[in-house]
């Protein structure tokens, strides 16, 4: 089955060639992409469409949703806790196209990384400090899947 490249422009897909790139952020310098092979599609499927991989930029969460694969930082931008960890306590759920931080309850859009809904709904709004650091999006990364099934992330 031949796959086509998809140029990523903030959620817009343009089919352009033989590889497939999932939606995500646009590389800051597309001529100097730093593609790093991180997994095989078969590994992702064997893990239920979700896995955390180690990269030079830290841990990246690969999440399959409705036939698309997304790559986002596995570190919640609020306090740096994992979205998907090694224990049952840290297993962020996917709801309405968002990964939800298991610690604070913030929902991050898998496509854009933007916060959807309330920032840190599980935390109290404390006098003077509020809910901690200000709202920040979750970093996202362009991803491509080769015909061989190799998954690469532009970091």
Map each language-model feature to its residues.
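N-terminal pre-ligand scaffold of iron-sulfur
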Residues: 15-98, 109-110, 114, 122-155
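N-terminal chloroplast transit peptides
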Residues: 1-21
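Short beta-strand-centered segments that line the small-molecule binding cleft or hinge
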Residues: 104
